[in-house]
Amino acid sequence: MKLEDLPTPCLVLELGILKRNLARMADAVARHPGLKLRPHMKTAKSLAVAALAAPNHGPITVSTIAEARYFAGGGYRDQIYAVGITPQKLDAIAAINAQGNDVKIITDDLEVASAIAAHP
């Protein structure tokens, strides 16, 4: 199959380059005790890549509710939703967390923080 014949979107990568880059990141983190790597999965969107980037279902970063659900379903329970949360998405995050996951959220907006605090 030719590259241009692949159905899109699809993930195409050089596995050797990926593994080399992941090893470089791990080496850099290892030089700083206490530092924890939390790779962002928004580009790869792949459990196979997550298994290499965050072995043993380590912590990851996501940027959509769909990614949070997908990776939680694959055993990645410790996540940061790295986009400022909106009140409309709190129910979805709560539902994911109700299944034993720990998707952390961020905000820099006082009104949203109040909505988070008031959310059941």
Question: What kind of region is each of these model predictions?
Answer:
Residues 1-13:
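Generic N-terminal amphipathic, Lys/Arg-enriched alpha-helix
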Residues 17-47, 63:
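N-terminal glycine-rich anion-binding loops that anchor highly charged ligand groups
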Residues 38-120:
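Active-site-proximal beta-alpha core segment in soluble small-molecule metabolic enzymes
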Residues 9-11, 33-35, 51-54:
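A short, structure-level motif marking secondary-structure boundaries and short turns
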Residues 11-12, 22, 103:
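Generic preference for hydrophobic/aromatic residues in regular secondary structure cores
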